[in-house]
Amino acid sequence: MASPTIAANAYANLARVLENSGAGKGSEASGQSFASLLKDAVGSVMESGRKSDAQTVAMAAGKANVMDVVTAVADTDVAVSTLVSVRDRVISAYEDIMKMPI
């Protein structure tokens, strides 16, 4: 299970991404699209996974500390959990919209 500090850092990173993307500013023409926001989020999760894999390989080669590997894996776990939560909410919203009468 991820520590509260790791979770707080993940949510702070997400808030920073949303702030930089212009989310919450209304329908501003210069804002980032929802698709590009999701693409950035998925890219961030993939990068976190790559870092975790690199730390694991480095530990197997004797070049990394176990604590670094555990931290990298926990960061990846939080990122994936956050992405899964977002996916679930998007699916739920889509299902709610599909149930609405025309």
Swiss-Prot record:
GO MF annotations in UniProt: cytoskeletal motor activity; structural molecule activity
Disulfide bonds: none
Location in the cell: Bacterial flagellum basal body
GO biological process, alphabetically ordered: bacterial-type flagellum assembly; bacterial-type flagellum-dependent cell motility
UniProt cross-references to InterPro entries, sorted A to Z: FliE
Keyword ATP-binding listed: no
A GO cellular component entry from the record: bacterial-type flagellum basal body
Keywords: Bacterial flagellum
Family, similarity comment: Belongs to the FliE family.
Entry protein name: Flagellar hook-basal body complex protein FliE 1
Organism: Bradyrhizobium diazoefficiens (strain JCM 10833 / BCRC 13528 / IAM 13628 / NBRC 14792 / USDA 110)
